């Protein structure tokens, strides 16, 4: 590793953010104590943590660094004529009321049901301008890596750790290794960040990033919008990574400017000057590297029961016989048995029962626009739910007439929430049904007991909706 002109060693962005937040250094016997800039909470993983605080008589260490919303268990259907929300059960209603009480008692800013800013936590946080470059961000949710799109070190934590951050604003953490994923070239027509991340996970495998933070680099990544970068970082965990991030640039700053929690005036100028120093230094080294060519990719879709089991929509369902490793062969056989798919058969043409467009992976305005491109002037042939990721997304989409396009196509336009991604709120599929979903996980039963999930981009999902089967969105857009 060559030294910089000032004599210092080149550092990655992960090094820079980590070093700036170490309260106590890591030793062989103990993890580092890491300061946390932003703690996002929602109604499902936080109640137990607040209960522990009450039992121990503790207050929040930095309530202004904590921001709350509701998303997992809330209904995506509107209030009834009686003004009540149609919760799926009493437990869901109790989670919401408990969240309201916890935030009121501990002084946490909450944007709950009926609030104009409410949304899926990883859509809502960035929209508020709360997520900023160089921050450490945590949330009791697996897909917290979404916020890495801003050049933040963001990762999910467990319920006990939620309590630790509420009480101390710190966490015990071991320094992660680094993995550079460089994407050359540019994505072709009909492809998006979702296709890119599915291709990356298929290449790495679901454990390929274990113990690492992924930094996404290269011209194809730089060309992505902030929405695309959030999709990319969101699914880093599905490759086993602790987090994923993209260094901030003018695209980042333009997206953040003017948002409620973003710095203003002179403070904004000072912040941008700091943020410009965050990208990895020339000559910085990574523990591992992976390189892909974006121009060689095709629209992707999963066929199995983990996000790493992905192929091009033009491809064939893999044959386990081709697997030399016995364990990998058994895993593939089990996945195909659950999914009911035939080895060697084209995935295109596979009948689809339900389509879900939404989630913290693909519930942003850009995703709504992509889906509308395919739905406009066409009719869906299967049940289709389009669920905006936040009230802001919903409002913006409706201002553009996207809701009308969705409804005229025969699809359902819903209220914001996690919805069918995790199927906690009554939005689910039935046993044996196939769902093309823009969410992030295709585990057995993820969208309902016995349900079969195929992960894809909004374009590919919308193409499945209007054809009733897995289809190449490029052909649908071309009218073929």
Swiss-Prot record:
Molecular function terms, GO-annotated: 3-isopropylmalate dehydratase activity; 4 iron, 4 sulfur cluster binding; metal ion binding
Cofactor note: Binds 1 [4Fe-4S] cluster per subunit.
Domain of life from the UniProt record: Bacteria
Cofactors: [4Fe-4S] cluster
Claim: Ribosomal protein is one of the keywords in the record: no
Keyword Metal-binding: yes
Keyword list, A-Z: 4Fe-4S, Amino-acid biosynthesis, Branched-chain amino acid biosynthesis, Iron, Iron-sulfur, Leucine biosynthesis, Lyase, Metal-binding
Pathway: Amino-acid biosynthesis; L-leucine biosynthesis; L-leucine from 3-methyl-2-oxobutanoate: step 2/4
UniProt cross-references to InterPro entries, sorted A to Z: 3-IsopropMal_deHydase_lsu, Acnase/IPM_dHydase_lsu_aba_1/3, Acoase/IPM_deHydtase_lsu_aba, Aconitase_4Fe-4S_BS, Aconitase_4Fe-4S_dom, IPM_dehydratase_rel_enz, IPMI_cat
GO biological process: L-leucine biosynthetic process
Name of the top EC class for this enzyme: lyase
Positions contributing to [4Fe-4S] cluster binding: 360, 418, 421
Enzyme Commission (EC) number: 4.2.1.33
Catalytic activity as recorded in UniProt: (2R,3S)-3-isopropylmalate = (2S)-2-isopropylmalate
Subunit structure: Heterodimer of LeuC and LeuD.
Function: Catalyzes the isomerization between 2-isopropylmalate and 3-isopropylmalate, via the formation of 2-isopropylmaleate.
NCBIfam families membership: leuC (TIGR00170), PRK05478.1 (NF004016), PRK12466.1 (NF009116)
Protein family according to the UniProt entry: Belongs to the aconitase/IPM isomerase family. LeuC type 1 subfamily.
Name used for this protein in its record: 3-isopropylmalate dehydratase large subunit
Lineage: Bacteria, Pseudomonadati, Myxococcota, Myxococcia, Myxococcales
């Amino acid at each position: 590793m060559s030294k910089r002109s000032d004599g210092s060693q080149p550092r990655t962005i992960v090094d820079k953010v980590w070093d700036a937040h170490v309260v106590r250094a890591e030793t062989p016997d103990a993890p580092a104590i890491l300061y946390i800039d932003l703690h996002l909470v929602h109604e499902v993983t936080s109640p137990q943590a607040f209960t522990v605080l009450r039992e121990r008589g503790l207050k929040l260490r930095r309530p202004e660094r904590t921001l709350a919303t509701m998303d997992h268990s809330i209904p995506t259907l509107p209030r009834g004529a009686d003004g009540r929300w149609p919760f799926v059960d009493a437990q869901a209603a109790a989670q919401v009321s408990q969240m309201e009480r916890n935030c009121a008692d501990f002084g946490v800013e909450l944007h709950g049901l009926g609030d104009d800013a409410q949304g899926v936590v990883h859509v809502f946080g960035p929209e508020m301008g709360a997520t900023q470059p160089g921050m450490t961000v945590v949330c009791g949710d697996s897909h917290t890596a979404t916020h890495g799109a801003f050049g933040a070190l963001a990762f999910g934590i467990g319920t006990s750790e939620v309590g630790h951050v509420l009480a101390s604003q710190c966490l015990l953490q071991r320094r992660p290794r680094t993995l550079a994923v460089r994407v050359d070239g540019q994505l072709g027509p009909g492809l998006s960040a979702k296709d890119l991340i599915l291709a990356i996970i298929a290449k790495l495998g679901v454990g390929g990033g274990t113990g690492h933070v992924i930094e996404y680099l290269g011209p194809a990544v730089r060309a992505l919008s902030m929405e695309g970068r959030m999709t990319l970082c969101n699914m880093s965990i599905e490759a086993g990574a602790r987090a994923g991030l993209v260094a901030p640039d003018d695209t980042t700053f333009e997206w953040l400017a003017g948002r409620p929690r973003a710095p203003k005036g002179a403070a904004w100028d000072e912040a941008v000057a700091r943020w410009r120093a965050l990208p990895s230094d020339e000559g910085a080294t990574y523990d591992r590297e992976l390189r892909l060519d974006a121009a060689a990719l095709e629209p992707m879709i999963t066929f199995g029961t983990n996000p790493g089991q992905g192929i091009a929509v033009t491809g064939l369902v893999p044959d386990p016989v081709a697997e030399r490793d016995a364990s990998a062969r058994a895993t593939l056989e089990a996945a195909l048995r659950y999914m009911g798919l035939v080895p060697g058969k084209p995935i295109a043409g596979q009948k689809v029962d339900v389509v879900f467009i939404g989630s913290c992976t693909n519930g942003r305005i850009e995703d709504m626009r992509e889906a509308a491109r395919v739905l406009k002037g066409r009719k869906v042939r299967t049940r289709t739910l389009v669920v905006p990721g936040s009230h802001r997304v919903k409002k913006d989409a409706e201002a553009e007439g996207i809701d009308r396009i969705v409804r005229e196509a025969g699809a359902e336009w819903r209220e914001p929430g996690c919805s069918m991604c995790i199927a906690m709120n009554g939005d689910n599929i039935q046993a044996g049904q196939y769902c093309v979903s823009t969410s992030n996980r295709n585990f057995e039963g993820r969208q309902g007991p016995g349900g079969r999930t195929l992960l894809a981009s909004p374009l590919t999902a919308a193409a499945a909706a209007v054809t009733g089967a897995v289809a190449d969105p490029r052909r649908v857009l071309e009218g073929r």
